[in-house]
C-alpha cells in the first residue's frame, strides 16, 4: 500500500518535496538527502506525518 508523504528539513522548516512510500517495506520514517534551495546545499529531509 503506497501512501503520499511530505519531506521536511527540520532546521529550516522547509517542506519542499512530496514522494510516496510503501508502508509495508518501510514502516519507520523515511530520510532522504535532497537539495535545499534556501541553504544552497544537500541536506537530509525527513518524513512528516
From Swiss-Prot:
The keyword Metal-binding does not apply. GO terms for biological process: translation. One of its GO terms (cellular component) is ribosome. One of its GO terms (molecular function) is structural constituent of ribosome. SUPFAM superfamilies: Zn-binding ribosomal proteins. Keywords: Ribonucleoprotein, Ribosomal protein. InterPro entries: Ribosomal_bL33 (IPR001705), Ribosomal_bL33_CS (IPR018264), Ribosomal_bL33_sf (IPR038584), Ribosomal_zn-bd (IPR011332). Belongs to the bacterial ribosomal protein bL33 family. This is Large ribosomal subunit protein bL33C. It comes from Streptococcus thermophilus (strain ATCC BAA-250 / LMG 18311).
Amino acid at each position: 500500500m503506497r501512501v503520499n508523504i511530505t519531506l521536511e528539513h527540520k532546521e529550516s522548516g522547509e517542506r519542499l518535496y512530496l514522494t510516496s512510500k510503501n508502508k509495508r517495506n518501510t514502516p519507520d520514517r523515511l530520510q532522504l538527502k535532497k537539495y535545499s534551495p534556501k541553504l544552497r546545499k544537500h541536506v537530509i529531509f525527513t518524513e512528516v506525518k
